[in-house]
Amino acid sequence: MSSTLIVQLDMRTLCQEADITADYVVEIVEHGIVEPSGRTPEEWLFDDQAPLLARRAAKLHQELELEWEGVALALELLQEVQQLRSENSMLKQRLGRFTQM
């Protein structure tokens, strides 16, 4: 029998893992970059992908001096590019089967 481990991080742990301030986390949540469960920052719980997203968001905000809206858009577009690359790779493999016949 297999079990799935679900990791949830509180605000303090997310701040430590992503090396960002609580103020940054609030901004990131307000702009929909990460979506915690819970109603208030004290109750927020984040999944295990949140530190990576939060770190990327903070880096874009600081290094490129993007507004948070721009950060959210940039991350969304980067995710879309990655999905399209994966889909393109899969389709190339499928096409390769037909061209080798």
Curated annotation (Swiss-Prot):
Record-linked InterPro entries: CbpM
Superkingdom field: Bacteria
Pfam families in the record: MerR_2
Similarity comment text for this entry: Belongs to the CbpM family.
Function in brief: Interacts with CbpA and inhibits both the DnaJ-like co-chaperone activity and the DNA binding activity of CbpA. Together with CbpA, modulates the activity of the DnaK chaperone system. Does not inhibit the co-chaperone activity of DnaJ.
Protein name as catalogued: Chaperone modulatory protein CbpM
Organism: Pseudomonas putida (strain W619)
Gene name of this polypeptide: cbpM
